[in-house]
Amino acid sequence: MGKGEELTTTKYLIHAQINANGIVEKPDVVGAVFGQTEGLLSNDLDLRELQRTGRIGRIQVMIHSNGGRAKGEIVIPSSLDRVETAILAASLETINRVGPCEAEIHTVKVEDVRAVKREQVVNRAKEIYKNMIESASPASMRMIEEVREAMRVHEISEYGEDRLPAGPSIHTSDAIIVVEGRSDVLNLLKYGIKNTVAVEGVSVPQSIGNLSKKRTTTAFVDGDRGGELILKELLQIGDVDYITRAPKGKEVEDLEKDEVLVALRDKVPTAQFLANHNILSESDSKNSHKKHNGKHNNKHSNNKHQQHETKVKEEVQIEEIPIEDDETKLMKDMLKEFEGSGCGAILDEALNMTQEVEVENIYEEIKNIETSADTVIFDGIISQRLVDVASLKGIKRLVAFRSMNIVKKPDNLKIITMD
């Protein structure tokens, strides 16, 4: 390999440091490297042969002298594999003389040239991509956005006689998200959220109110006064389970994906939202509490209205049986047997245990019930999720130590707790 020829297949660079107790020159160092490693390793790793066949490159030496001592760096390009390169790097440390002087060589590192090249490729690709974006003409960007918008518009559906803008899943989803306008539906559709419906104005159509009573409903309103007005109207005629808002001063149609996901993740039960934000007038609050409690207890709606009139700022919990009858006492006595066990049981109509369950698997166990079951009793907390699946499976009683965040209780299900 000629002196001017560069090694083009370099995989690694061996970096070594040399210290000599005297003044030495570059040829002295190169000679010591070849001479003192000769015969040390097998013929396959002989430096002269490796250089002749192009498997190592030209040895580079940068050295300088000061105060009668010399120090510098040795760099050897290698196209050998990792193991062979490591052996070669270690062999340099056996050199103890350079020219007439005692010397010491220490391998500092073995650099992976390909990793450096990959990093260069990534950085350069970023620059090229950035330039592509910046150089794209406004007309091209508008054209791309028009195509994307057309695709979203094609997916948009309609709901009810009012032909309200809605996502394609509005007719099949068990949960819906109510927003203000068509632009909000389009924006959420862009992020893959398809169970939305728009009220199209401050006056909420009755069809939305009726739909909200059949589905688990989340109101997603703008973070301004308009959002509050729509929320008030929706609470007057509908049944809202959860509420969330865009950040203050922002509209749902302008939110980025992360903002949308955070807002939906942080939704809270309606009663808790009203108590925290205090955005309803007193009469509105009365109507809202009456509606939430009267939904499942219409015969006693007037009494419930009076009971909750002074509790506007307290979280509304599902009312459980206030008078402890014999059945309730029996259930509580049975529950005490499971206290601290982390277990529960599925009972038939005669209150005979048909299956013992682990609390951590309680949801799946109820979901997979195939035989007739009457009661589920367990050492844990009753959640809205358990209420929903128990109702679906025809369970008549859920018995546990307490309940949490239950906003919708089916008429066919009785909840008994120690609270």
Curated annotation (Swiss-Prot):
The keyword Manganese does not apply. The keyword Ubl conjugation does not apply. Keywords: DNA replication, DNA-directed RNA polymerase, Exosome, Magnesium, Metal-binding, Nucleotidyltransferase, Primosome, Transcription, Transferase. Coiled coil: none annotated. GO terms for molecular function: DNA-directed RNA polymerase activity; metal ion binding; poly(A) binding. Residues 288-305 have a biased composition (Basic residues). Binds two Mg(2+) per subunit. It comes from the Archaea. This is DNA primase DnaG. It comes from Methanobrevibacter smithii (strain ATCC 35061 / DSM 861 / OCM 144 / PS).
